[in-house]
């Protein structure tokens, strides 16, 4: 009897010791986990506070006076997923560029041949290119020669180099307009707003440097380019009224096409791709349901032959 009591006492002692050890380990593990969670929450809070503070500084710095007034969103006819450029507007926009913008700005990345079939016929573009002279190979004596333009040539700029452009514009460099729509935040909305956003007089208290003009959509509000579009400044070939907004819309559409001449073909190809992939997807569903499902779910039963007696 005494031995039985001793065994029971020993078992209880061991079980209590094991329980206390396990409880202590669990307690330590819980405290460690709690510390890690607390540290993670604190780090996340510090990171969030830092980001919010930096964002507040950026928001204070990004004022309309420094970064320009935000251009409103306009309903451009080519913005939809299935919409294409208004090619009549591209033709009118080229006319505005040639008669107004080409005096200062270039289109170095646009070749004459890209206009064929988009806004002009082959003969029209060929005649326009031949109005300009390009450098040709020198003659036998090494003297430089000139030749009429060809469809493969690029539209020439108004100045031979950057120094000449700055000298003619009081030190300001007119940007190339080939990619201007893609190079400016807001794209077409910004270009249209900039062209039509010149007020008659700058706001009271705004001091402009000599030779500058005020435009709220330009960063800083001071721009070297003066207002260039006025009503009836261009006589459109198709008889469209040449209002300031109409000319700005047309030349913006033309510049958007210059920056993205593959726009229409890209959307056309995208539509074809969606149709083909959708058809293949439906075909795969049919194959899965009516052809592959039976193969995938079938079962083979093997009945071993009975041994012969």
Curated annotation (Swiss-Prot):
Bilayer disposition of the protein: Single-pass membrane protein
Entry note: cofactor: Binds 1 heme c group covalently per subunit.
Side Mitochondrial matrix, residues: 297-309
Subcellular location: Mitochondrion inner membrane
Co-factor(s): heme c
InterPro entries: Cyt_c-like_dom, Cyt_c-like_dom_sf, Cyt_c1, Cyt_c1_TM_anchor_C
PROSITE patterns cross-referenced by the UniProt entry: CYTC (PS51007)
Gene Ontology BP annotations: cellular respiration; mitochondrial electron transport, ubiquinol to cytochrome c
Alphabetical list of SUPFAM superfamilies matching this protein: Cytochrome c (SSF46626), Cytochrome c1 subunit of cytochrome bc1 complex (Ubiquinol-cytochrome c reductase), transmembrane anchor (SSF81496)
Presequence positions on this chain: 1-61
Compositional bias segments (type: Acidic residues): 131-140
Keywords carried by this UniProt record: Electron transport, Heme, Iron, Membrane, Metal-binding, Mitochondrion, Mitochondrion inner membrane, Respiratory chain, Transit peptide, Translocase, Transmembrane, Transmembrane helix, Transport
Binding residue positions for heme c: 101, 104-105, 225
Subunit composition and interactions: Component of the ubiquinol-cytochrome c oxidoreductase (cytochrome b-c1 complex, complex III, CIII), a multisubunit enzyme composed of 10 subunits. The complex is composed of 3 respiratory subunits cytochrome b (COB), cytochrome c1 (CYT1) and Rieske protein (RIP1), 2 core protein subunits COR1 and QCR2, and 5 low-molecular weight protein subunits QCR6, QCR7, QCR8, QCR9 and QCR10.
More info: Present with 39900 molecules/cell in log phase SD medium.
Protein name as it appears in the record: Cytochrome c1, heme protein, mitochondrial
Provenance organism: Saccharomyces cerevisiae (strain ATCC 204508 / S288c) (Baker's yeast)
